[in-house]
Curated annotation (Swiss-Prot):
Similarity comment: family membership: Belongs to the glycosyl hydrolase 18 family. Chitinase class V subfamily.
This protein's UniProt keywords: Carbohydrate metabolism, Chitin degradation, Chitin-binding, Glycoprotein, Glycosidase, Hydrolase, Polysaccharide degradation, Signal
Pfam families linked to this entry: Glyco_hydro_18
Molecular function GO labels: chitin binding; endochitinase activity
One Gene Ontology cellular component annotation held by this UniProt entry: extracellular region
The organism of origin for this protein: Coccidioides posadasii (strain C735)
Residues in the signal sequence: 1-17
Catalytic site: E171 (proton donor)
Catalytic activity reported: Random endo-hydrolysis of N-acetyl-beta-D-glucosaminide (1->4)-beta-linkages in chitin and chitodextrins
This protein's record includes keyword Mitochondrion: no
Protein name, per record: Endochitinase 1
Glycosylation sites: N387
Amino acid sequence: MRFLIGALLTLQTLVQASSMSSMPNSYPVPEAPAEGGFRSVVYFVNWAIYGRGHNPQDLKADQFTHILYAFANIRPSGEVYLSDTWADTDKHYPGDKWDEPGKNVYGCTKQMYLLKKNNRNLKTLLSIGGWTYSPNFKTPASTEEGRKKFADTSLKLMKDLGFDGIDIDWEYPEDEKQANDFVLLLKACREALDAYSAKHPNGKKFLLTIASPAGPQNYNKLKLAEMDKYLDFWNLMAYDFSGSWDKVSGHMSNVFPSTTKPESTPFSSDKAVKDYIKAGVPANKIVLGMPLYGRAFASTDGIGTSFNGVGGGSWENGVWDYKDMPQQGAQVTELEDIAASYSYDKNKRYLISYDTVKIAGKKAEYITKNGMGGGMWWESSSDKTGNESLVGTVVNGLGGTGKLEQRENELSYPESVYDNLKNGMPS
């Protein structure tokens, strides 16, 4: 899930935001956070358990209000299905029994449920799509039958696996028809979730969120106000502003545009946030996405200059985990006026744009000052620990864990096909 918003940038005039048509307001109004009740959201990817050696048990769960478990895939019929059943439901972790009677679930989803049992303020959502699977949205979203299949099967996975909702990551609707289809897809999902909530013993509301674009060439195509009626909050992907697809090196997650080197900031978080609010999305429903990684530029003379290649990376070329930063021999530059930072090795002529602890603190200030809904991170395996943790820095900047949203999760799933989950994962 690397959100290449810059890859689609053209020299054409950006499409203006679509007009908002009226829709019935018969759906529950999403819960606004209490004063100071910030959301702390992180993506956990199911492939992290392999080379990265990162498992759900490694999460510092008390720092988060929501974990988005990524990713489920979509069939042309609209059926939502798990993308890696061994990681998702089959892998046995220490303490999992091989001779447990009945039909039982294991893997990462069991571990997510156990995290919820130990931290009743932690919610988990099944995230569907992502960059790789996003082309699979178009066909099922275009028909009522496909949308119903999507809503019904994502709801079933939520009930079977013990999630508190679903997160949709469609990158990105390409035209007005697909934008309309997205609204209708969210409507179908909201109706399915609310129908289940109405008959659920506890009657709790189940959540619906999306990963939303920060590039105007993408969000100007969306019907933001109409979508907002069905969403609990928006995870704004305010990163990947610059990368290998550009002609000059740039900041990949700056809050404000640079006035001294505008070519280094083709996008900014602040513009996206203001445009969303102008379109009708409440600030307290916008969760600011932040990267736990950096993007690299090789053979460059500095920020905003030409480059040639991206060099190596932690797991893919040109992308470095935050915990691998800064590299030996590189000098770190922090630009507080635009809330951006980077490292540069003048001998190797190698630049990496990433967030430092100081810049994470500036982003926490921005979230607070603008009354936003909290912070989100991609992805959980890449952070440092202790005082160097970007997540911890932002959470502390928002006032600490006591200022996070207080909303109890759901542990009762009487319709689950898995006996151990249906019984609350007895020890």
